Amino acid sequence: MKEKLTAAAYIAGWKVTSRLPKPLAKVLFEWGADVASKKGKGPEQLRRNLARVVGPENVTRDLVRRSMRSYMRYWREAFQLPAMAGRELAEELNRNFVPGSLELLHASAQSGRGTVIALPHAGNWDMAGVWLVHHYGTFTTVAERLKPESLFEAFVEYRESLGFKIIALTGSAVPPLEQMEEVLRGGGTVCLMGERDLTGRGVEVEFFGEKTSMPAGAALLAQRTGANLFTARVAFRGGSTDPSPARRGGPETWEHEVTPVAVEGQTLQQIVQEMADNFARGIAQDPQDWHLLQPLWFADLSQSRRQRLGLEEAPGEDA
């Protein structure tokens, strides 16, 4: 029942927000972010995560407030994206790539080898998808099967309406990895979120000086198919969250950058570690835009989860 109520509230909020004028939606979502930044498990874990990035002494109330505003800006834009999407938005996104990144993506598309892009949960990663659809027709990604099913179906319908192709992480007759391999061998593009290991079967890496695990999917796909592999940095610019006081308060826009990752001659662990290093550089540049409110590092996991991952023995087991 709780899941159904949550789904109903989410879908209702989605429909209401999509019809609100942008200035009103912005005020409401920033108010919600400011309230949420003061308490709750999510903001508390966000503080711990940000402490790894900027140092505990630099996790100020202002940084946490801007981080929560950035997180809520993502959801506001997600709810309003169908009305925003179009040629004008795609052209603006085109202008907001860091010099050299567009050329890398175009060259990869023209190579016919396929393109894999791994992104952290930062900025608005859906905007990268809008750009890909405008330029290349579509791209493929994987989504966690949310509960209840009605929420997952709404999520899929929304993103497919934007031109995204969605593969469920679980429940498919053909494994997701095989489906994505087929896309890449046809010269297509796959985008995957890259820093949260949802399955517990990821690759151990060092991230901001501490141990965690990250998904191996993007690296495996590049190894198996010969596709070009990139990590992406996605950040907000303007608005109330910009790290630059000079830009803060200006028109809301975005910034995108891609970095190639070496695959040939590298082990899986080396590839995923390079991806983690790239993510770290991007997150350090815009820590307020990293929307990770869940535990990531091994040190923050619950005892039961650490035991499931084999990081420590269960009580009563021999040492």
Model-found features: residue ranges?
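Membrane-anchoring hydrophobic helices of lipid-metabolizing enzymes
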Residues: 1-119, 152, 156, 163
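Short Gly/charged-rich anion-binding patches and loops
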Residues: 12, 45, 103, 127, ...
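Short, contiguous strand/loop micro-motifs
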Residues: 33-34, 91-92, 115-116, 142-143, ...
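Active-site metal-coordination segments of metallo-dependent hydrolases
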Residues: 42-45, 148-149, 212-215
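Non-catalytic C-terminal accessory region of glycerolipid acyltransferases
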Residues: 56, 60-61, 65, 107-109, ...
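A conditional alpha-helix N-cap/helix-loop micro-motif detector
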Residues: 95-98, 122, 148, 170-174, ...
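Conserved beta-strand termini and adjacent loop/short-helix elements that scaffold enzyme active sites
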Residues: 100, 142-144, 169, 259-261, ...
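Catalytic core of membrane glycerolipid acyltransferases/transacylases, capturing the structured
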Residues: 111-171, 200-203, 242
